[in-house]
Regions:
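Short linear motifs at protein or domain termini
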Residues: 1-74
Length: 74
C-alpha cells in the first residue's frame, strides 16, 4: 500500500474557503459589509493575521473590496 503525503492546510486557506462559500451562497450580497476582522477571527476561531490574509486573497480574487478605514465589502 502506498501512502500519500498528508497535506497541511493553512488556517487562512480555510478562512478563504468559508468566507467565499458564504459570499457565493449569497449570505453576503453585493454591497454588504463584512464583519470586522476581530469578529471574523472569533467566529472562525483563527487569529487576526489569518483573517487579514484571507481577506487579502479574496480581494485579489475580486470577491470583496477592502476600503481602508471604512471596512470590507462584497
Amino acid at each position: 500500500m502506498k501512502l500519500r503525503p498528508i497535506q497541511r492546510s493553512r488556517l487562512y486557506e480555510s478562512a478563504v474557503d468559508q468566507i467565499r462559500s458564504l459570499i457565493l451562497a449569497e449570505d453576503y450580497k453585493p454591497g454588504d459589509r463584512l464583519p470586522p476582522e476581530r469578529e471574523l477571527a472569533e467566529q472562525l476561531s483563527v487569529g487576526r493575521p489569518s483573517v487579514r490574509e484571507a481577506l487579502r486573497i479574496l480581494g485579489a480574487m475580486g470577491l470583496i473590496e477592502i476600503r481602508a478605514g471604512n471596512g470590507t465589502y462584497v
